[in-house]
Amino acid sequence: MKLKALSVAVTVALTSFTALAADEQETVVVIGSALDQLVQTEINSDTLEKKQASDIKDVLNTMPSVTVDGNARYSRKVYVRGMEDKFAVVTIDGARQEGQLFHHSGDQAIDPAMLKRAEIELGGNSALSGSGAINGSFSYETKDPSDLLKPGESIGARVKTSYQTAYERFATNVAVYAKVNDKLQFMGIANYSEDGDLHIPDQEAVTSKQGELKSGVAKVVFIPNDANEFKLTFNRYNDGGKRQLSGEKAGALYADDEHNYHSLNRDTVTLQHEYDAGSDLVHLKTNIYYNRQYMERDVLVDTAWDKDANGKWIKDGTIAIPDREYNVTTIGGDIRNISWVGEHELTYGLDGYKAEQWIDAGDGVYQSGSKQGETKKYGMDGGTVTAYGLYLQDMYEFSDFRLTTGLRYDVHKLGGVYDGDFDQLSPKFKGEYQTTDNLKLRVGYGRLFKGASLPETLTMKAAADVKQSDTKAMTGNNYEAGFDYELTRLLAADYAILGFTAYTYNLDNQMHPTKNNTTLANQYDVEVWGVETVLSYALDSLSVYANHSYSDGDQKDLDNGKTSHMSKTGIHNFKAGFNYSLNSEFVFGWDSRFVPGNDYTDEDGEQVKRAGFATHNIWAAYTPTFAKDLEMNIGVDNILDKKYAEHTGFGISWGSDKYTSYEAGRNFKASIAYNF
C-alpha cells in the first residue's frame, strides 16, 4: 500500500539524518518534517553521549518553544509554548508522570544516561498523545540491550567516568548487557553522580545545592517468535542531599543555613508487548505500568507557627517533625491496535490511569511554646484521579493530500478528599498538502480537555481542611498552520528542510497544582499565541540546525476579571548549532542560544525587565581506531562565562533579582568510557 510504504520510509528517515546502506549509493528518499528531524537527530543516545548530557536541560536545550530553567538538577522546570509542562503529557517507557511533589522543584526526573530517544509533539492536535495534552507531549524511551550490543556480540559491559567543573559533578556509569539467545536479552545500567558547589559568574559559589544522583534501569526483552515482543523494565531515579529544599530559589538566600536531607525519587515499572504477524488488520501494542514519584525528608526540629487574634502568623515555640515521605503513584495502561483498511491507517484503543497522593509520616511533638507536649499529625491521605479515554485516529492519503483525523472521549473523576466528574469528546485534525515537490502546507486543530489534576503533594491538606470550590475541567482549542520546504536541491545538500508553524490556543478554567490544595480552584482563562521556525541541513560530514520560537499570552483572573500578561511568555529564543565529523575517529560541534532582552507590565501595573543573553557550548568526541572500545569526550558549556537567567525562571520572570537563580557559569567537562 502506498501510505504504508510511505510511513515505513518516514520512520527510517527519522531514525537518522542520513541512512547509508552497504551500497554507498543508497540514500534516504522520504524525509519527515523539520521539527521531527530536529528531535530525532538531537535527542538520541549517541548525540547526548557526545554532548555529555547529564540532566533534562541538556536533553531539551536545542528544541524550539521549550525552555528549561533552574541551575541545579533537582530544580529544573520545563516550559512549553508559554506554559509549564504540567499542561503536557510526560511519559517514560509509556508510564505517565502525574502530579507535582513540590512547587520549587522540577518533575521531569530522567537521567540522560538511560535515554535512548524521545518523541516530542508540540500542541494538542493528536488523539494519540493521551488525556490532558494541552501544550504538548514528551515520550521518553530508555535503552534496550540491542542498543548496547555490537554486531556479533552476545555479552558486553561498559564503564564510564566523567567530571564537570561548574557543578563539581563527578559521575560513574556501569552497564552490563547480554543476548542469551535469539529470544532473550537483558541489561542493567547504574549511574552515580555527585554534585559539589555550584559556580555562577560574579557570585560566591553556591554551597546549598549539593547532592547525589543514584539512578538505574534493568530491562529484559523476550522475543518468543517473529510476531511477539515483550519488554519488562524497572527504572529508578534518586536525587538527594543535605541542601536547600527550594531548589529553584537563589542559593545566596540559604548560604548560612544548616540543611536537612531531602530527596526527589521515582520508581517506574513497565511491561510492554507488541504483536505484529504481518496482518493489515492487527498490529497490537500494549503497555501497563506502575509509577511512583516521592519526596523524602528527614526529621528536624523547627519553629512552630500559629495565628494571633488578628490572624497574623507568629512564632510559638518549636516542634519536632518526624521523617516524612510525600507520594504520588500512577497505575495505568494503554492498549492500541493499528489496522490498514484500503488507504486508511486506523489507530484505535483505550488508555487509562489512576493517580493517588498521600503523606506517610508519624506525629510531630511540640517541644516548647503554648502547645508543648501536644502532637500534630503529618501523615494523611489526599486526592485521587481516575481517568480513561477511548481514541480513534485515521490517517488517509489521496492525491497530494494527507489527512489525519482523530477523536478522543475522555472521562476524568476526582476522589479521595476531592469530588468531581468530567468528560469530553475532543475532535483532532491535521492536514497536509504537498503543493510542489518541495513545499508542504500544514494545518491543525485540536479540541483541548484536561480534568483537574492532583494539587501539590508537599502542601496537602487533611480532609477536614479541604473546602473545595466548584472545580471545573480545563477546556479550549488549539489551532496551527505552517509549512515545510525542502531545500536539498536548492542548497546542493544531502538533506535540507525549513519548517514554520504559527499557533494559538486558549484554555478556559486553567488551574495550576501549586498550593491549590484547599479549594482546588480554577484560576485563569488564558490565551497563548506564537511561532516556530526550524532549519535542518546536512552535507557530507556536516550537520547544521537553527530555530527560533516566540510565544505571547494573556490571562484573565477568574476572581476579579482582570487581564494581565503571562509572565512566562513574551520571550524570543534563537538556537543554532552544528556537528562535523573530521574523520571516522573525531567529531566536534557547537551549540548556541540568543535570547533578547524584553519587558512587560505585570498585573499590578509594574514594569518587569528581563536582560538578554547569549551562550555558546562546544564539544568534541574521539573514538581512536587503535582502540575502538575507547571513547573520550570533552566540552565547554557557557564558554564565555556569561551570567544569565532563563526568562521563565523563578525571580526574573516577575522582576525580583533577590530570588533570581542564575545559571551555571563556564563548565569544563570531560568523560572517558571503555567497552568490554
Question: Model regions: which residues?
Answer:
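C-terminal beta-signal and terminal closure region of outer-membrane beta-barrel proteins
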Residues: S131, A464, V528-W529, I571-F574, ...
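Acidic, small-polar-rich N-terminal luminal/periplasmic segments of exported/outer-membrane proteins
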Residues: A22-G152, E168, G247, T268, ...
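Periplasmic-side early beta-strands and strand-to-turn transitions of outer-membrane beta-barrels
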Residues: P145-S146, S154, Y167-A171, A175-L264, ...
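Surface-exposed extracellular loop regions of Gram-negative outer-membrane beta-barrel proteins
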Residues: N238-K242, S246-A252, G369, K413, ...
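Short loop/turn motifs that connect adjacent beta-strands in outer-membrane beta-barrel proteins
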Residues: A22-D23, S129-G130, P145-I155, D182-K183, ...
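Gram-negative outer-membrane beta-barrel transporters
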Residues: Y396-L403, A492-N506, A521-E603, L640, ...
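Membrane-embedded beta-barrel scaffold of Gram-negative outer-membrane proteins
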Residues: T161, L281-V301, L441-R442, K472-V531, ...
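Face-selective signature of the C-terminal outer-membrane beta-barrel domain
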Residues: I223-Y237, L264-Y418, Q434, R489-L491, ...
